């Protein structure tokens, strides 16, 4: 008879469930400014310590410290703060619109505004973002018309996508924002392919893509990294580790064993892990990765270490699977508050101006929502049926012609 122990299956479990005290002590958070910043041209094999630490710039006193400090101008910092506040104001008002029956679905970016806004500001015109549904800040930073967002969310007659997408699956090619897809694993593959095409044409444009940490368990993630590595695709591939894939905690995707940034090592590409609630740290990491991509040094995988402070969507109640006050205990704080405190520490901001800006942006959002409501909310106004046949085929084939005839169009 064997003395071997019986095999047992390991099932990862979160540290805290509803009713428990939130606990993030498992995460080692280094001091701001502690991590070295290597030169952009540094070979990948000399960068293998970076995925196991955390790039941080803003300390607890609101000061920007260390080698990753991008030394942004006060104007750039204020623009970043304003865009983050606009994103949050828009989220709050459109979330309420869902509760009022004006839209069928909505998803908020609460707690994750910093990385989308910073990365949108770093990338250049002509670069392409392959987004997930929590990077509304990218469009806000590019000046996308708020009323166009509202019209799509309300699914009304002026929906710029003519009812072809879910309310929050935006598409804005002219703003460097590729069509959002509910098939979240596809983002990396599309971005790598786009970046390879840019390199093949001898262009100077790069791609940036997002997936959530849960999606790293899908095959698309690994296939994209293989192509990115082999062909040195000029791309920045971001894993937004916000701790929760709907109700599945990050450990289900492997966070208990290693970092998501460390997954880059197997493919021979650099991996960075960045404080996703630190606007300056995200800016610096993205700038570094962008310089590598534009220098024909290939892709970089960035783990954006952050926290989803709201529910997954309007269809989700996070209190069913995590402590109700878990967001308050997140050790990296609120990205808006941290950037505000940095500006105050610089003498470039104060609480009065902050309150005035919040009120001003709320009025801007309110005006856009009213304009959309005048066109129509859910079920009150919708695109014409004939528009489902337009903008799809350059030349309609016989099936489309027959379908139009059957509908009397």
Task: Tell me the role of every PLM-derived stretch.
Residues 63-64, 136, 242-245:
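A short, flexible beta-alpha/helix-coil linker loop
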Residues 89-92, 96-233, 249-256, 261, ...:
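Cofactor-binding active-site loop characterized by glycine-rich and histidine/acidic residues
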Residues 115, 140, 246, 282, ...:
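Short secondary-structure boundary/hinge segments and terminal tails
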Residues 1-115, 310, 319, 324-409:
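Conserved acidic/glycine
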Residues 176-374:
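Glycine-rich ThDP/TPP pyrophosphate-binding loop and its adjacent helix/strand module
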